[in-house]
UniProtKB/Swiss-Prot annotation:
It catalyses: aldehydo-D-ribose 5-phosphate = D-ribulose 5-phosphate. Its EC number is 5.3.1.6. NCBIfam families: PRK00702.1 (NF001924), rpiA (TIGR00021). CDD domains: RPI_A (cd01398). GO terms for cellular component: cytoplasm. The gene is rki1. Belongs to the ribose 5-phosphate isomerase family. This is Ribose-5-phosphate isomerase. It comes from the Eukaryota. One of its GO terms (biological process) is D-ribose metabolic process. Keywords: Cytoplasm, Isomerase. The keyword Repressor does not apply. It is found in: Cytoplasm.
Length: 274
């Protein structure tokens, strides 16, 4: 454990995510990048932490997928951009709720799925980082909260029964945290429905059916979009899966040596976002 990890006092799961993030950035940081996408969720803090150590990072434009990642970019003094101004993204780093053996995944637990899908579509490479709990054979095996679906507010009531017809088990409108009355509202002013379909053996077919429903803005099924995924395990190893079919496991001693980072940088990025 390096000095930064001691100061941060990371749990085994957080350390696993951090190791996986550092390796993902090291292996996928392009030569002379111009635009990089920054996803949402708990892993992206460690992604940015590693990006700050890369050469030429000050000249790179970073595109966020939501408010959290926007604040992360700004608070670290990086250049902020929008997808309408920079539609060509070299690589995007993001997290996931669950990834299956075919690198299809469920995303949107943080209610940013439309922006995440847009940046993933614009990116030449989508690199996913998560802890090993998100690694499954079939979608729905471990993630039981359902497929997030962003919908127009006026359409949610009509969409719920149609999702049941498609096989959803008690789909629900996602409600806000205890401090907020009413449903979760996305950055785009829409609602989120969480629809659990059990084991999803054909994500592409399910995605197509849901997307056709009137009022659906986006579906949290990311099909045939991932270039590589990095899963961090509690033992410090990192499992790497690529769209080419390549799969390998990097043992803990290697990841520990490869992911030393300056303690000051780590402390800076560990501070709460404003």
């Amino acid at each position: 454990m390096d000095s930064a990890e001691k100061k941060l006092d990371l749990s085994p799961i957080e350390l696993a995510k951090r190791l996986a993030c550092h390796m993902a950035v090291d292996e996928n940081y392009p030569e002379n990048p111009k635009v990089i996408g920054i996803g949402s969720g708990s892993t992206v803090v460690y992604v940015v932490e590693r990006l700050l150590t890369k050469p030429g990072v000050d000249s790179v434009v970073f595109i966020p997928t939501g408010f959290q990642s926007k604040q992360l970019i700004v608070n670290n003094g990086l250049r902020l951009g929008d997808p309408d101004c920079y539609p060509n993204v070299d690589v995007s780093f993001d997290g996931a709720d669950e990834v299956d053996d075919n690198l299809q995944c469920i995303k949107g637990g943080g209610a940013c799925l439309f922006q995440e899908k847009l940046i993933a579509f614009l990116a030449k490479r989508l690199v996913i980082v998560a802890d090993s709990r998100k690694n499954s054979h079939v979608l729905g095996e471990y993630w039981k909260k359902g497929v997030p679906i962003e919908v127009m507010p006026m359409a949610y009531a009509s969409i719920l029964p149609q999702l049941v017809e498609l096989g959803a088990i008690e789909p629900k409108l996602r409600m806000g945290a205890p401090g907020k009355a009413g449903p979760v509202v996305t950055d785009n002013g829409n609602f989120i429905i969480d629809a659990h379909f059990g084991l999803i053996k054909n994500p592409k077919e399910l995605f197509a059916k849901i997307k056709l429903l009137v009022g659906v803005v986006e579906v949290g099924l990311f099909c045939d979009m991932i270039s590589a995924v990095y899963f961090g395990s509690k033992d410090g190893s990192v499992t790497v899966k690529k769209a080419s079919g390549e799969k390998h496991i990097i043992p803990a001693p290697v990841t520990a040596a490869a992911n030393e980072v300056d303690a000051k940088v780590a402390e800076t990025n560990a501070k709460p976002l404003n």
